[in-house]
């Protein structure tokens, strides 16, 4: 018997919707990353993108533990001298709640072309509405 190696024809992607209301950020991000990579499937291969599509709604109602709202900071640099910008988690949740979950999931994915392709399958929305009803996403229960 030969070792099975999946090909692009073997990939079967499904759509799932996750309600992020009152879920902890890091625990939710790990479950989403697991699904995006396809590690829940028996035909998982680390060199292929065989994960599912994930739609996350109500991202503005996400929770964090401890004092992270005030203490956690996100940094970016413009490339110019003195161009370091920082924003706290509390301000980022108030202005762009989708970016909080996207940043958390991005940090857990591979840092290469494959990781960027996996991240494109994640759709995050602040409110309860999403435009992916035509794909008939199944509700995904997050367990932790």
Swiss-Prot record:
GO terms for molecular function: mRNA binding; structural constituent of ribosome. Keywords: Ribonucleoprotein, Ribosomal protein. Signal peptide: none annotated. GO terms for cellular component: cytosolic large ribosomal subunit. Part of the 50S ribosomal subunit. It comes from Nitratidesulfovibrio vulgaris (strain DSM 19637 / Miyazaki F) (Desulfovibrio vulgaris). PANTHER family: LARGE RIBOSOMAL SUBUNIT PROTEIN UL13M (PTHR11545:SF2), RIBOSOMAL PROTEIN L13 (PTHR11545). This is Large ribosomal subunit protein uL13. It holds the Pfam family Ribosomal_L13. InterPro entries: Ribosomal_uL13, Ribosomal_uL13_bac-type, Ribosomal_uL13_CS, Ribosomal_uL13_sf. GO terms for biological process: negative regulation of translation; translation. Belongs to the universal ribosomal protein uL13 family. This protein is one of the early assembly proteins of the 50S ribosomal subunit, although it is not seen to bind rRNA by itself. It is important during the early stages of 50S assembly.
């Amino acid at each position: 018997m030969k070792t099975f190696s999946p090909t692009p024809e073997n990939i079967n992607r499904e759509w799932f919707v996750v309600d992020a209301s009152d879920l902890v950020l890091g625990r939710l991000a790990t479950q989403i990353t697991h699904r995006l990579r396809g590690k829940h499937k028996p035909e998982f291969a680390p060199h292929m993108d065989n994960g599912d599509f994930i739609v996350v709604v109500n991202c503005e109602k996400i929770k964090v533990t401890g004092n992270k709202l005030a203490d956690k900071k996100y940094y970016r640099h413009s490339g110019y001298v003195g161009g370091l910008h920082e924003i706290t988690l509390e301000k980022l949740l108030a202005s762009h709640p989708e970016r909080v979950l996207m940043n958390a999931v991005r940090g857990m994915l591979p840092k290469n072309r494959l990781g960027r392709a996996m991240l494109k399958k994640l759709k995050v929305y602040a409110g309860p509405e999403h435009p992916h009803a035509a794909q008939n996403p199944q509700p995904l229960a997050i367990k932790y």
